[in-house]
Amino acid sequence: MKQSALFEADDVEAISIDDVAFSLNVSSASVRNWIKTGYLHKATKNSVTAESFVAFKDEILGTEKLNQRANKSLKDQHDHSGLEEMIHNIIRSNEVHPEGLSDIYEESLSESYKNKEGVFYTPKEIAADFFDYLPKDCSELTFCDPCCGTGNFLIEAVKRGFKPCNIYGYDIDEVALEISRSRLKELCGVAESNIEKRDFLSASYQIEQKYDVIFTNPPWGKKLPKKDKDSLADSLATGNSKDTSAIFFFASMKILNSSGYLGFLLQDAFFNIASYESVRKAALANQIVALIDFGKPFKGLLTKAKGIILRKQCPDDQHATICVSGNTKNEVSQRVFEKNPKSIFNFTCSELDLEVVEHILSIPHKTLRGSARWGLGIVTGNNKKFCLPEARGGYIPVYKGSDITRKG
């Protein structure tokens, strides 16, 4: 094992992909796959943020299973035109119920396609959960899913009382849109014209209509040309939050009616990584109705999925956010998140934990910013296997955290 270099405090924002690969003893391709799936977050073309690396190392890496899979190639054979033809033929033949057609299409997408496009379709039960936080009577409200895919949010909107003529869906995948239309026609008995092929980010400036409810699952980590991403981020004033999902958030807020509801299903990083600070602060300027931890609902994707539902309305000092994690549900003052460093949404903590953190942060204190050097420790991925109690050829002596005491 070889210890990686120390980084000066001013350099800790980013770590090169090659350094991460060396530290974790995997290939650069594996690191890039982890970037695609949302575990690590790009700082530049060839580096990741130090914060996401530390979080990945501490919270995700460490199981031998993950390391065994690290260099395993993703399924990369994907004939989308052939898949399109198959789906069109099935629709024309009426051989499969539209609900089943949705499942067939989603399961036919290769892992490489999903990762490239950031496509992980919302499970039906999760889509249903979002609607539990809306008013009971939605009959006069308008609904939009700007990344509607095969239509799980759209179908649930009909079931919850939205009129079909008030439901709008956009996507760039014509096959997914055709499935959405088929499902809505099967459910409502009429074909609606509000389901359109449209690149929502490019078209958001041209959409004059505003909506009362916008629920969506935006692409996770989809790559946009840097020029397009920077242009969108600047025009939408996204601050330091330039990930695709953050840009979708600001674009959606732009077409949401005052007092309207916005619900996003997002990767775990959105709620706690520094690069999303700007979008979290934008969310905190509104009433955050609920924060929900859905665990790991996507097959083949280890990152957690979490939901945020907010109302486009200024919060008062007494506003409480419903926080759901597993079987636990409690209400937490929204102000707690405003006081957190980087406005982190640590909503899966218990009420007592949140009170302790708030108390600690309220005490006058100093930080190590500008006064310390930051270094990467040795990352084995499996300490039980690679950290030995006796000397052996090719190994070097190291200190564990527990070896360091106040006396040295």
UniProtKB/Swiss-Prot annotation:
UniProt keyword terms in alphabetical order: DNA-binding, Methyltransferase, Restriction system, S-adenosyl-L-methionine, Transferase
A Pfam family hit: N6_Mtase
GO BP: DNA restriction-modification system; methylation
InterPro entries, per database record: DNA_methylase_A-5, DNA_methylase_N6_adenine_CS, N4_N6_ade-DNA_methylase, SAM-dependent_MTases_sf
EC number(s) from the headed UniProt entry: 2.1.1.72
Entry annotated with the keyword S-adenosyl-L-methionine: yes
A GO molecular function held by the record: N-methyltransferase activity
Keyword Acetylation assigned: no
Catalytic activity: a 2'-deoxyadenosine in DNA + S-adenosyl-L-methionine = an N(6)-methyl-2'-deoxyadenosine in DNA + S-adenosyl-L-homocysteine + H(+)
Top-level enzyme category: transferase
Function: A gamma subtype methylase, recognizes the double-stranded sequence 5'-ATTAAT-3', methylates A-5 on both strands, and protects the DNA from cleavage by the VspI endonuclease.
Family: Belongs to the N(4)/N(6)-methyltransferase family.
Listed name of the protein: Type II methyltransferase M.VspI
Lineage per the UniProt record: Bacteria, Pseudomonadati, Pseudomonadota, Gammaproteobacteria, Vibrionales
Gene of this entry: vspIM
